[in-house]
Design a protein with these regions (language model features):
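Short, conserved acidic/polar surface loops in the N-terminal third of protein domains
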Residues: 70-73, 91, 121-125, 156-158
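Acyltransferase donor/substrate-recognition loop-hinge adjacent to the catalytic core
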Residues: 1-12, 124-162
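Short, internal active-site loops enriched in acidic
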Residues: 115-120, 152
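Conserved GNAT acetyl-CoA-binding A-motif
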Residues: 105-116
Length: 162
């Protein structure tokens, strides 16, 4: 059975291990020391999802009144997914549990800022699929670009213009 609970300082080692060694889409920005640098400016409301003793996912978030935001102290956030054993069905269950939690906590809105694909070790959109499947909608889109420094490519005029 999938459960979720708020992050606690006692979870730091487990959280950082998952972020650094076992996630498909986390970056160093999700390590607790980096996140807690902003502790005085954001009400941390990060969540830990588990299935029995197995860690299933993390959600780096802050709370602002009745809004849960994929952490306000970071450029992006979203669901931190493991590199193995997590697919669309699990993502749907996690998002369902997140919605139930928000209802119970009188949170009326979730702002989700996914990790750009260029930072994924194993790119996937299981989280985006689950959000859309559960009735979520896109409210904002951002452009991400990457340059392979081992094979630089000069952007053409159309790329520069957007």
């Amino acid at each position: 059975m999938l459960t979720l609970r708020q992050y606690d300082a006692a979870d730091k080692a487990m959280w950082d291990d998952f972020v650094i060694r076992r996630s498909r889409n986390a970056t160093f920005l999700f390590c607790r020391d980096y996140v807690e640098y902003h502790a005085d400016r954001f009400a941390d409301n990060s969540l830990v999802f588990s299935d029995g003793r197995r860690l299933v996912a993390l959600f780096l978030a802050s709370r602002h009144g009745d809004v849960l935001q994929a952490h306000g102290g970071l450029t992006y956030g979203g669901l931190v997914m493991p590199d193995k054993g997590f697919g669309a069905a699990t993502a749907v269950a996690v998002i369902g549990a997140l919605k139930d939690y928000c209802r119970a906590e009188n949170i009326s809105r979730i702002i989700y800022k996914p990790v750009p694909h260029i930072y994924h070790r194993y790119p996937s959109e299981d989280d985006i699929y689950a959000i859309v499947a559960s009735g979520g909608r896109l409210s904002e889109a951002a452009v991400s670009s990457a340059i392979d420094l081992t094979a630089p490519l000069r952007p053409d005029e159309n790329t520069r213009r957007g």
